[in-house]
Amino acid sequence: TTRRYLEILEKYKVDPGMLEMELKETDTIRYENIKDLLRSLQEAGFHTALDNFGVGSSFINLIADVPLNDVKLGRGFMEKCEKDYRGIGFLRQMIEMLKNLGFQVLCEGVESARQVEILKTSGCDHVQGNWFSMPLSAKEFEKMLFLPGEIFCRCRKNEEHSTGGEA
């Protein structure tokens, strides 16, 4: 598996460090096999991440042992922040726990300046969501890369919190 990935990358002259291999939380059913595969991928230079953490069948009791670089919190965490202060408290505690375990934390589903501010004050490393850019086709993304003065996103120009995609 890892060797096969490396053969393909070598054929096309792609550095494994340029790619991120994502593990979905629901994939953890085969945890032991995945743990070995992720370790092998990391040793080969791949960046590894857990996507949509907290969405599926949680494996919070195993996360400290999984060889990952990043954990991506699913959009449900942001939706809870909009409901009440308990959602914000839960999000902050989750981010703190993941950071204490040595992970970079990315929050998905960010859709407002308020959410960006909450994440900035919570220690979140990276954010993504419709607040920064709606999903783009490859052609639209390519056009955006060459816009002068732009930072790879269509930020809301008239808003105070139009950062470039990171908290």
Predicted segments with their positions:
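EAL-family c-di-GMP phosphodiesterase catalytic domain
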Residues: M18-Y31, F46-A167
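Generic alpha-helical secondary structure signal
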Residues: T1, L9, K35, P135-L136, ...
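Charged helix-capping and loop-helix junction motifs
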Residues: R3-E7, K35-D36, Y85-R92
